Amino acid sequence: MDRFKMIKEVGDGTFGSVWRAINKQNGEVVAVKKMKRKYYSFEECMSLREVKSLRRMNHPNIVKLKEVIRENDILYFIMEYMECNLYQLMKDRVKPFSEAEVRNWCFQIFQALAYMHQRGYFHRDLKPENLLVSKDVIKLADFGLAREVTSVPPYTEYVSTRWYRAPEVLLQSSIYDSAVDMWAMGAIMAELLTLHPLFPGTSEADEILKICNVIGSPDEQSWPQGLSLAETMKFQFPQVSGNQLAEVMTSVSSEAVDLISSLCSWDPCKRPKAAEVLQHTFFQGCTFVPPTVRSKAGVLPKTPPCVGVKGVSEHGMPRRYSTGTLSTTKPHSNASLKSSGLSKTGVQRKLQMDRQAPQKIKKPTESNNKLTTNRVPARNSPGHPVLRHSRSLPETGRATMHKVSTLTERLTHMSVTSRTRTTPKPAAPLLKAGLGKSDLLGKTDEIPPAKRLTRKLVS
């Protein structure tokens, strides 16, 4: 940790504290998460749920884990730094955010959730404190409670802050899925648009009461599984007639109310998937670009993969482990290679030509500066060597060429007649790039009628 200078503590939680720090080597500002418990082996560190999940995800709207360092049995996460979290922004606001701002943020979050859910993970702890903001970019953070969809239940009962906790979790269901993230996003969206929590319960029972007051009590048609869960834990839903969300959010558009209503459905199966939410009319005008396409087209900046993880061996010497590739997409360098027009074949060709020791064909001196030369268009960039084929049409007078190459020395006097195509008697050798003369020139155009012209090549 000597490479980092701690500047200021910016957060403190149950499992650790977060500091703003500077990398002394390159001046980069990073976030350092210092875990409170001690870890006595690096293998134990690498088995942490947060490390395992972040190593598998690479998305512009998911915070990057740069390094994992274990020093003196203390574990540090080196992560990319963001200016603040969503809770801090809401706390300092006087009036609610505009729908345009909420639309921009939520669209990014749902893209990250769609990416995450499709790869078999769900967050389980979505709340404004875990949504980090820098300017108009927002990213998911704190994957300490993230879990794989394929994990074997029962799951832990405590998940997320109570105000954003899904009803199936409140009723202590041990089986749930990514739908809990959808419920949390509905509550967060409503809070962004009103600056008031949608379900501010003081306990689990009070939280369910707050939910019933807004969307009504569940019944056999809306959520039969929920009634069974309540019966199991000897809980009875209060009988409240519902669907009063529009009354709570009077200054919000009908599209936003409709989306929040679908996200905050009692039945998890009736909540839309993250990928489906991106197609909702509330996000009309926003363009969804899948991460795989985005990295190729360069629509959004691609986030770099993890730099590595670092531990301390028994002898006190630091050891670095690779965190692996975070994405199956092609590296950014490949995308820039395509955009600049440098094909892989061209680069290989350049390398092959550099290995040889070719005799250079020097440009002939033209007496009247009217010699026409057919050539392959050259590019002044690596991977595109200039390939020339020396074939010229003479003027009426004789053109003298100096220092003619070995190729042209083999040619004798050549004459061109009207409507007649004349080719040199000996076949021209292949070019060094592996292309023949005919490949470069394609079809040879006939020379228009003219009086007999003669050209001599002089060594």
Curated annotation (Swiss-Prot):
It comes from the Eukaryota. It catalyses: L-seryl-[protein] + ATP = O-phospho-L-seryl-[protein] + ADP + H(+); L-threonyl-[protein] + ATP = O-phospho-L-threonyl-[protein] + ADP + H(+); [DNA-directed RNA polymerase] + ATP = phospho-[DNA-directed RNA polymerase] + ADP + H(+). GO terms for cellular component: cytoplasm; nucleus. Residues 310-397 are annotated as: Disordered. The modification Phosphoserine is found at S151. Its EC number is 2.7.11.22, 2.7.11.23. GO terms for biological process: intracellular signal transduction. The modification Phosphothreonine is found at T156. Keywords: ATP-binding, Kinase, Nucleotide-binding, Phosphoprotein, Serine/threonine-protein kinase, Transferase. Residues 4-283 form the Protein kinase domain. Residues 322-346, 366-375 have a biased composition (Polar residues). One of its GO terms (molecular function) is protein serine/threonine kinase activity. Belongs to the protein kinase superfamily. CMGC Ser/Thr protein kinase family. CDC2/CDKX subfamily. This is Cyclin-dependent kinase F-4. It comes from Oryza sativa subsp. japonica (Rice). The lineage of its organism: Eukaryota, Viridiplantae, Streptophyta, Embryophyta, Tracheophyta.
